[in-house]
């Protein structure tokens, strides 16, 4: 399984100034539960915003720079990350360039919708989801955060595939 996961504002924003501009502990717990034991693929800016490897998961950072930290593996591309991950479950966790490149590989896209309107000079927008390629599931309430909604988009498969 290869999945993309992110939270998005009503304006389609996923980040401001290299950071996630909201904090919902229940959504962080859900993220941890879903991604635990899998391989995470992220860009360098996303890694720097987190500040450390996420425990219980393999952390692959797509970067042209070497990051010398225990628990981090540097790769040059999404394709190299997927080759390193092998048959493991993979979650693409940001940023925008990683999401765009991951679209051609993803089996599903797990989106949390936050009600927060945000602004800033350095905004990052969510990737466009092609509903010709991804079937939208139902809009569901978040299990732990009443203000949030979530939806999983599943890749449409060709007939006979």
Locations of the language-model features?
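Enzymes that bind and transform nitrogen-containing heteroaromatic metabolites
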Residues: 1-161
